[in-house]
């Protein structure tokens, strides 16, 4: 009888210990999830910035990677990738280096069609067209004979100029993940075709599918802040071996470099 009571007490103690320990792990996970969400909220605060010249006066996260007198450079990058079934993958996008020291902005409009050779290996056909930004307008810095392409470049808008995440708290099916070994972290949300950002993308790009996209926020580096890590977002419409349709965007603050543009 005494042995039965001791055994019962022992089992009860183990169950209580396990329960408390489990609660501890749960609190840690909840805390990390909150930290990740707060980190992405800081990233999304720049959306929208309609006038790109506002970045000249916008401060970013600084650490020991920055020289004392370096005000830093904002790097904005937007790209649409479309690979219809049975066709080549094509990407069209732009990257702009907004230098706060010189208050000048230079970059490239980049078109890349990826073909495959006889062995199925990818072949890049990348073309870069140099541009500058002045008075919030994109201007090609070299002659472009193709009028349609020239107009596409001049009318280009970065996602940060029109994207808006004020309703992110209402996004459904939030899936938060964290890998401490890299470290890397992400948040995935299922969107609807009625969502503002999705409507804006469909308005600006000829997206050959009516499928509802998912929003993936990705980051790596120290969650508390680092100029070495990166953050970007992706709207994934279709992703498989035969067909890919997605849009990527990033706004990064980095130490300035002489050869960056």
Curated annotation (Swiss-Prot):
Which coarse location class applies to the principal site listed for this UniProt protein? membrane
- One Pfam family name is DUF576
As given in the record, the signal peptide range reads: 1-22
Covalent lipid sites (S-diacylglycerol cysteine): 23
* Organism superkingdom: Bacteria
Keyword Cell membrane among UniProt keywords: yes
Q: How does it sit in the membrane?
A: Lipid-anchor
**GO annotation, cellular component aspect:** plasma membrane
Keywords, sorted A to Z: Cell membrane, Lipoprotein, Membrane, Palmitate, Signal
Q: Where does this polypeptide localize?
A: Cell membrane
Homology family: Belongs to the staphylococcal tandem lipoprotein family.
Indicate what this protein is called per its UniProt record. Uncharacterized lipoprotein SERP2445
Which organism is this entry from?
Staphylococcus epidermidis (strain ATCC 35984 / DSM 28319 / BCRC 17069 / CCUG 31568 / BM 3577 / RP62A)
